Amino acid sequence: GADYISIMQANLKALKKTTEQEGTEIAAEKEEDTKTVQNGYFEDSAVKDRTLSDYAGEWQSVYPYLKDGTLDQVFDYKAKLTGKMTAAEYKDYYDKGYKTDISNINITDKTMEFVVDGKSKKYTYKYVGKHTLTYSKGNRGVRFMFEATDADAGEYKYVQFSDHNIAPTKAAHFHIFYGGESQEALFNELENWPTYYPSKLTGQEIAQEMLAH
């Protein structure tokens, strides 16, 4: 815990020199190509279709860890690293981003199960394509889109994943967007991006993952 954090603090100056990005992901220790893609800079030709199996697994929302203070160390670190916002401002920004009532999502290569207040809803999905968004600071992100084949999927009919990858690979964490209106309607959602990490991780382990990226 504390030792890891203090080591990260000691790396602040070095990190500032090696990364110019704006705080959402600190990827200085990644390979150059991966870092570039992770930061949202890539060629259109590099974007490939993906399957639901890239997201298969049991996942937990990080929102409870923001609420109970576990992630405060992450916001403190980001504030010191970037100087763009205070720790409190980062926490408020991520509160809006992480906010969700879906505590867990369990995914197979064909289905998604959403758990809200201990009750689950499970639907079958098909892949329907990918869409690249360009953000205000010039970087980009790819949404991988899935659609429920069940008639009663309601607000879970249209689902999009964003995991900072643009081609087939197993997701380490992801942001999810969902709704009952259309895929296009979800392209406009840039403020709320519920975020999920493997269910087996503790809050402290998730905080360390965030600091290491």
Language model features with spans:
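N-terminal glycine/threonine-rich, aromatic-flanked beta-hairpin/loop signature
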Residues: 71-126
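Sec/Tat-exported extracytoplasmic proteins
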Residues: 15-23, 56, 63-70, 97-98
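Calycin-type beta-barrel ligand-binding domains and close structural analogs
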Residues: 30-45, 107-213
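Extracytoplasmic metal-acquisition and chelation regions
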Residues: 1-36
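Aromatic side chains
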Residues: 4, 55, 125-127
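Solvent-exposed loop/turn segments at secondary-structure junctions
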Residues: 1-2, 66, 166
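Beta-strand cores of secreted/periplasmic/IMS beta-sandwich domains, seen most often
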Residues: 53, 58-64, 104-107, 113
